[in-house]
């Protein structure tokens, strides 16, 4: 119950924070719309790992405060950049594709991978197998964060090209 409240309330706060920060920083340099998401993901990763590997539920909840707040940080800036880069008549389809991929991996393949790793790790590590499996999944989040940083480097050029194509 506590974790669900943390995710719900923290996710809402984080989503709003991301929108505000991304808009503010993006006015100075549009690349910050992507860089912000990448940096926040990298900063949150160690907190996630510590939470997943914690010995007690209370300690895990404390470590997971930051990751629950920034867990949905990517959503607003990502949709904004997606809508900026595609033609107006393609925004609905682009959003649908992004949400489809997000759900396939986030709600389908990701949990399946965690379960399979947990099953494989439990004979050796006991009840810690699930925590280790979750901690290993942080690597995928870091990989995504690095790609936000890389994507940010060419974002201004990509936006200019998209706007030129729209004319």
Regions found by a protein language model. Give the residues of each.
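Transmembrane alpha-helices of Major Facilitator/SLC transporters
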Residues: 1-25, 40, 108
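Transmembrane alpha-helical segments of major facilitator superfamily
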Residues: 2-11, 67, 102, 140
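A late C-terminal transmembrane helix in Major Facilitator Superfamily
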Residues: 11, 15, 85-123
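Hydrophobic transmembrane alpha-helices of Major Facilitator Superfamily
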Residues: 12, 57, 69-77, 104, ...
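Membrane-interface helix caps of multi-pass small-molecule transporters
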Residues: 16, 20, 24-25, 53, ...
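C-terminal transmembrane helical hairpin of 12-TM major facilitator-type secondary transporters
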Residues: 30-78
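A membrane-interface helix-boundary motif in multi-pass transporters
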Residues: 32-35, 116-141
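Multi-pass alpha-helical transporter architecture, strongest
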Residues: 45-55, 135-167
